Amino acid sequence: MKNIIFLKLFYCFLILFVNSISNKLLADWPQFRGPTGDGRVNVISHPKKWSTKENLAWSQAIAGGGWSSPIIFGKKVFLTTAIDSKNTKPLGHAGGVRNMRGKKPTEPFDFNLICLNIQDGSLDWQKTITKKQPKFSIHPSNTYATESPVTDGKHVFCYFAAIGKVAAVDFEGQLVWNVDVGAFPSGNGFGTGSSLTLSKGKLFIQCDNDQDSFVLALDVANGKEIWKSKRSSRTSWSSPFLWKNKKRTDLVVCGSGTVTGYDPASGKTNWRITNARSAFTASPASDGRYIFLGNSGPMSQGPLFAIGPEVSEESKLDITKLPKGIKWAIQRGGPGMASPVVSGEYLYVCSRGFLSCYSKNSGKRIYKSRLPSSKSIAASMWADDEHIFLMDESGKTFVVRSGKEFEILAENQLDDLFWSTPAVSNGNLLLRGSNKLYCIREIRGNNDK
């Protein structure tokens, strides 16, 4: 009897210990779209209302240009930027459309990794990874520091695809290693934007371009190549996603009209879906069981589909006859630049100023509603089971109630240009604008969260 009681107490303690470790890991925001890489948060504790006069804890000017997302580990915030002598900043959607083609750089940029204190935004250190002149021009709306860094809690890994540089820096700002993986021309001259992810000592890099595409795994300890897989895909801007399903773990890489699942350990192709129409800008969403993904071209909306762990080998996406492993598919429902997100039983997709809600189990569209007076949306969504957050480029964030009915709970405004995907940690919301990094946090004396 005593043994049974002891075992029960031991298991209870073990569960509490594991949960505490899990919650600590989830409290940090170590990569693009958070710890699970899909924008999901267990419970969002940052304020639901903010402005320049409400719940704005601090703002910090950031030199140069960069659409990379900030990442958070403990009290440290990391982000990258590329700085020239003119302190060049990106243009918004309208400005980019008017100018279209960017000018080829005529001078070198400082490619920097910055570390800030999350409490007050003060600068801990700034490290110049390299000073180099990019070989290719980019779209005026893009930057030379659009790829988000990632951390394992000991080092920060950053990737500047425009110059082909990958580097590891410790938490004191010391360069540990750096390697060159090559710089290549991009489709339509837009530039690059695929962020990093890592797992089990491997750093994964997606480099889809118009010359020599590949996905690469580097050893986090020294930057040496573990495996490299050549790809037929042309330019794509989606980021690699680690999908831990009931059968295996896949490194999911979305390319131009294709989605491929690689074995993260070896680089072997586990499965491949073709006929997905065009290049992917958005990254996958997930509910922990399935992944949800899609794309859209500049003139029309592309497919939206769900993939289950039964997917295997190579198959062609066919809406009329779904191949094995495709749970459901819609001909026209894909996202624009903003990655979709799962909240509860629903999948949310943003495209062309509309928010669409789908049943994640069947793909049935529940609603499609216009976001009032919204501008272009590039930043990916984030959500818990009760709220969905979307931020347009003008700094307006819509807080939408999760569920079958479209209901905007709040609209929050900051004055800057925003394309970067936010970061969330321990009641803090970090929003990167073109000019400043903003920290939203409950300020005592504010009545509403």
PLM regions: where:
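Noncatalytic, solvent-exposed loop/strand surfaces
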Residues: L25-K449
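Bacterial N-terminal signal peptides
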Residues: K8-S20
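Positively charged n-region of N-terminal signal peptides that target proteins for export
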Residues: M1-L9
